[in-house]
Amino acid sequence: MAIWVLLCCVNLHAENIDPDEDGSQYAYGENAGWVNFEPDTGDGAAVASDKLTGWVWAENIGWISLTCENTTSCGTVNYGITNDSAGNLSGYAWAENVGWVSFSCDNTSSCGTVDYGVTIDGDGAFDGYAWSENIGWINFGIANNYVRACKVNFEDLANFVSYWLDNGANPADLDDEADDVDFEDYAIFSGYWQDFCPDGWQLK
């Protein structure tokens, strides 16, 4: 248990949740309570086009690990949440106090009986349900309280253009080399277009 607590607080993955800092970081379960994807302490969740990484905090059950990479246990128990690049999540998370949390009925071939899953739309907003045998449903579609991941979109493009050809360090100087915003920075920006924001993204 001591090892788990120690590892949960090591910042292995930068988070990219709640880009507008408006509280878009919570799912809810009747038994789990509020599930926080951007907790104040420890590591949060990071969304990529192929997977989720990091940790989330549930007020009634504690830390939930989104990948075996958090504890270097993949050689023994290989688990995690995958993203098919279209926003359809699958796989399992793990909570020390309640066990496995399934993000898709495809995991258990139960979709014909109980059709559920968690999705991420084009704006980065989560929706749907995850399921745990020990605590039941976790709802990602709660009105006014939902999880949203940062995505590179027209807001970022407008901010990038506003810095075009500026000198000196600024959020659009993505190559961190010449201290100006030029075509090299644009090439980096275009590579992230419509994808999830990388670590340290400052163009929101």
Where would I find each of the regions flagged by the language model?
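Bacterial N-terminal signal peptides
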Residues: 1-9
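Disulfide-bonded cysteine motifs in exported proteins
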Residues: 3-4, 69, 106, 192
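Bacterial Sec-dependent N-terminal signal peptides
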Residues: 11-15, 197-200
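Peripheral, non-catalytic segments of secretory and membrane proteins
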Residues: 12-151
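Cellulosome-associated attachment modules in secreted, modular CAZymes
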Residues: 148-204
